[in-house]
């Protein structure tokens, strides 16, 4: 059975836990292997992943490519300038054609609806590599990182400071599925999507939205932020001024739990959402987090292609 992975809820709590266990296990099993060597069982030998990029990427592109290589498979990379989808071919037609050529499709796009439509018309699994609504693969890596360092994810308090964006949406979703509270600190006008919050609360999610960054971070086990300003974004100076009280600096981290972890999906704008002393400091797990994109996405690929559960 094949399954698409557009949001964490597609897998449910049991599926997410299954993928996390697989990611941790496969990472340990690779000890001593060169990065380009396949896993010893090469479970996706002969399989091909098509990767559609409508947004530039470093981590998503390299981590998915290496994930498929380590699983024994191959990838094909496409962008809007090199495929007919960028010149008027419908999503439905693209999905049907690609389904005849490849075993799975990953898409990174500004338009979540495209990912949904691609999954609707494709006969193979579709994976959300990032959309304007959510970033589930990133949060799988975040969850794996916390699981490795703290031994659990359930019950740990997560604090988010900054823009109410796609990464936050997936954290909120994860909290509602796995049972950890999420406290959100955003300036007025930059809140997360109300529908995302409502869906999470309907699943029993414990969510606090506050304008007070100290209230949000106090005692938190995990502190997370992301870039505030996207390339070419209008009114950047106005947004930057609104966000500055939510910067993660040493004083803010000191308000969290003594052993709190700091996460950032990268790339970081140092001196804006986070200062060097935090991102390079003892609380920071960002390099493990970045590496775990690879391992978490291997588990996602296996789940989507019916090799897990």
UniProtKB/Swiss-Prot annotation:
Keywords: Amino-acid biosynthesis, Arginine biosynthesis, Cytoplasm, Transferase. One of its GO terms (biological process) is arginine biosynthetic process via ornithine. L-ornithine binds at residues 166, 226, 230-231. Disulfide bonds: none annotated. GO terms for cellular component: cytoplasm. Carbamoyl phosphate binds at residues 57-60, 84, 108, 135-138, 265-266, 293. It comes from the Bacteria. This is Ornithine carbamoyltransferase. It comes from Rhizorhabdus wittichii (strain DSM 6014 / CCUG 31198 / JCM 15750 / NBRC 105917 / EY 4224 / RW1) (Sphingomonas wittichii). The lineage of its organism: Bacteria, Pseudomonadati, Pseudomonadota, Alphaproteobacteria, Sphingomonadales.
